[in-house]
């Protein structure tokens, strides 16, 4: 782990500890000190090789780890086979919804990474977007705003300052115009409740759109990995590691939400923004069976709620408030007036 990584871990851990009651701080796992060899270390610029940085991902299988992805042999296409989903013990949330988790071992600071996975059948659920702003027009959405009727909630898209980035349609009305970017994708829910994707340029005036948002970068487009995620010299930072959040769909239409959490310091410090690279997250989404997927705002913004019927609500909170969120209701629940 490099000196900047240790400093980032310590800074975020202090923020997290500040949100924990004093009586429970003693129960937190202790943070290792910065190795002497790294104290005062200076990061020097280096020439980027054209290929991906060497890394691997392994999944826990009982008491052992099985490597299932290596950067030097990264596939350029995923077929929709959900090999990682085979390792998940699924818990029902509502008809057509389930969630579970897997443990990954990766390179560097991702040596212990938990992945929370949610599956949603859009035919048996209602999807809607939600926003929240203060009187000063600062972004203000967090898990505390999730309506009781919603079974799943997750922050949506990316944001610039206090507004969502790119195209936003709320209940049939355009809230923000489309953004432009070679790796942008639009997640669209039409008036019939169907989910569809628009990768690349988006037209502002579209009939039949109930809810929509844009995000970036595109991870998968009809099974293909975005070419910019296969090289280190294509304009995307393929070295940076962070807590990741992504949304995608399988060929049968199943919606998949995946969030990574730092798994080395216990659940209470899971929001520490250490985790996977963008190419690694693309691989995770491919191995979960998706053929279309996009990254959402991760890091300290990432937040996810799952409300099981008759069981306490599971919350994976973020530190930063966001301007936009996706809510998922059972098909019988109302989505308006939230």
PLM region spans:
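Zymogen propeptides
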Residues: 7-180, 185-186, 196
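Active-site-adjacent helix-turn-beta-strand microarchitecture at beta-sheet edges
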Residues: 157-239
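Short, solvent-exposed aromatic-acidic interface loops
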Residues: 132-138, 201-206, 259-265
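Conserved, well-ordered active-site substructure
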Residues: 163-181, 233-338
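A short, polar/proline- and glycine-enriched secondary-structure boundary/capping micro-motif
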Residues: 138-142, 205-210, 266-274
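Short, Lys/Arg-rich N-terminal segment immediately upstream of the first membrane anchor
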Residues: 1-6
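Small-molecule pocket liners
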Residues: 116, 184-186, 217, 245, ...
